[in-house]
Amino acid sequence: VPFAGIENFVPILDDDRTWTCGKGVYAEPVAEHALALALTGMRHIAGYSRASKWTGPAGRNLLGAAVTIVGGGGITESLVRLLTPFHCSITVVRRTVENIDGVDTVVGQENLVDALVGADVVFLALSLTPETVGLIGKPELEVMEPHAWIINVARGGHIVTDDLVWALENNVIGGAALDVTDPEPLPESHPLWSLPNCIITPH
């Protein structure tokens, strides 16, 4: 099944079917996509591609950037490897504080807000649980840097969508690149589609 989560199948779970998990199968391609989204957003590539005339310089480098990754599973491990040539300072937020190769700092989820402060780019790469629904809302977005991008390759429910729209419309953060949304699929009339600092790709 080409999507994450079993919520849609809960009504038909029974002992007549064998359910298996493809955990880790998509870690590397998802991490690659996350990196592509970060570069596209931070370097203002999407904006340049839509421009009919050139203006002043825009965008920032990923080289040497402060990176925060929320989640400590296979996608994070693959993403950390992909970030190695960029010499980023990497902080990982996860449930259990255990060292990860290539990561400068690992903190618990209770330190999420501190890990958002000063980050140039924030990646969401964690599973959706009752504790992580609405993990990123207005209080978290307000502490982020005005140039920071948030990249969500996890689940749409991690971000409070209305709060994200507010943050993007008011330039509270630099932008958002979303491989997942809440709701999903996103209605054609949703404001996220038309925001110049929002990139959306099909999960």
Predicted features, each with a name:
Residues 1-3, 14-19, 102-110, 195-200:
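Active-site regions of enzymes building and remodeling cell-envelope glycoconjugates
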Residues 1-49:
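Phosphate/diphosphate ligand-binding glycine-rich loop within oxidoreductases
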Residues 2-8, 92-99:
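Short, polar loop motifs at secondary-structure junctions
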Residues 37, 186-187, 195-203:
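Adenosine-phosphate binding glycine-rich loop
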Residues 47-78, 105:
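Glycine-rich NAD(P)-binding loop of Rossmann-like domains
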Residues 66, 88-89:
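Residues at the starts of beta-strands that form the adenosine-phosphate
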Residues 96-191:
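Rossmann-like adenosine-cofactor binding region
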